[in-house]
UniProtKB/Swiss-Prot annotation:
Organism: Nostoc sp. (strain PCC 7120 / SAG 25.82 / UTEX 2576)
Family: Belongs to the universal ribosomal protein uS9 family.
A Pfam family: Ribosomal_S9
Lineage, top ranks: Bacteria, Bacillati, Cyanobacteriota, Cyanophyceae, Nostocales
PANTHER family, A to Z: RIBOSOMAL PROTEIN S9 (PTHR21569), SMALL RIBOSOMAL SUBUNIT PROTEIN US9M (PTHR21569:SF1)
Stated name of the protein: Small ribosomal subunit protein uS9
Statement: the UniProt record of this protein carries the keyword Transferase: no
Compositionally biased tracts (Basic and acidic residues): 100-118
Stretch list, region Disordered: 100-138
Amino acid sequence: MVVAEANSGRAVYWGTGRRKSAVARVRLVPGTGQLIVNGKPGDLYFQFNANYLGVIKAPLETLGLENEYDILVKAEGGGLTGQADSVRLGVARALCQLDPENRPPLKTEGYLTRDPRAKERKKYGLHKARKAPQYSKR
């Protein structure tokens, strides 16, 4: 969905990403390549972890747009890894709305695929999802 912001008149591109229990609502705004997550700079929010920051910027780097758009994120739930992956999916989806030509390279890299893996539920009679009590033969 493309929305023109009333106060600045700039086009804003939206994308939502999910991973495990994390949800990220991402806005791409023409700018200088800043990452703002929940009102904090991205490197501070993700604890200066280059891996998380690389994951998030990967779709932009694939298309050569690293310093052309600011990424504004509202992330909730999960941990930092789930949030970083959900932001990546949101950025990729927003880039598809920006230009439909962006879709094939992003799809080839796997950035538009939602990771279906989630925590397996605990079963009764077991300690965890699969961990059984110690077996005693006698």
